[in-house]
């Protein structure tokens, strides 16, 4: 069974190609034009053990918002496609990830009901290279809404914006890997309703 999703999406603001292979090895080929964001998407692929391709052309002369949000939309759509009928997955998983003083928790339910509870307050606004830290929830919201996930993300502690954002991406990645893993003990779709 091949769990691959591929999306091509073009608007007046962005032109994107995203490919996700859930049963990958954690490789990434990412080019968004936003260096720190590329680094975060690479970390997401590596720690979720999925293969990820992102080719994005955006209106970066305006700012990074459209590129980050539209990458999240396309990433979510590709993930939803790769999940298929969701048969055999574990469905639920959580992860706590530290990065120096920062500690972030992510909890994922591959529920088919999109909801994001995002309690990661960055203590101070900062640009990380050409990446605005306040775009982080926009990315996760776009992924969650388009993949049909329920996700809770919490900052346990931390004060360095770089560490907090990176721990958030890695915690989400680890929880996503756990929730989308095929478990041979699971027969069919893991829901009493019979569908997700």
Predicted regions: what they are:
Residues 1-196:
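Structural preference for solvent-exposed beta-strand-turn elements
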């Amino acid at each position: 069974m091949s769990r691959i999703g591929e999306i091509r999406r073009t608007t007046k603001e962005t032109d994107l190609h995203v490919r996700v292979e859930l049963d990958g090895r954690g490789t990434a080929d990412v080019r968004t034009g936003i260096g720190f964001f590329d680094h975060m998407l690479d970390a997401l692929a590596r720690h979720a053990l999925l293969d990820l391709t992102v080719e994005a052309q955006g209106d970066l002369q305006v700012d990074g918002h459209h590129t980050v949000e539209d990458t999240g939309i396309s990433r979510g759509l590709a993930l939803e496609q790769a999940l298929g009928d969701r048969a055999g997955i574990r469905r639920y998983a959580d992860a706590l990830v530290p990065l120096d003083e920062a500690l972030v928790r992510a909890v994922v339910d591959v529920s088919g009901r999109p909801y994001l509870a995002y309690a990661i307050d960055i203590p101070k606004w900062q640009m990380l290279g050409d990446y605005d830290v306040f775009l982080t929830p926009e990315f996760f919201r776009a992924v969650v809404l388009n993949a049909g996930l329920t996700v809770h993300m919490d900052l346990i502690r931390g004060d360095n914006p770089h560490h907090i954002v990176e721990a958030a991406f890695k915690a989400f990645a680890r929880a996503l890997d756990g929730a989308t893993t095929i478990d041979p003990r699971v027969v069919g779709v893991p829901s009493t309703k019979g569908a997700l």
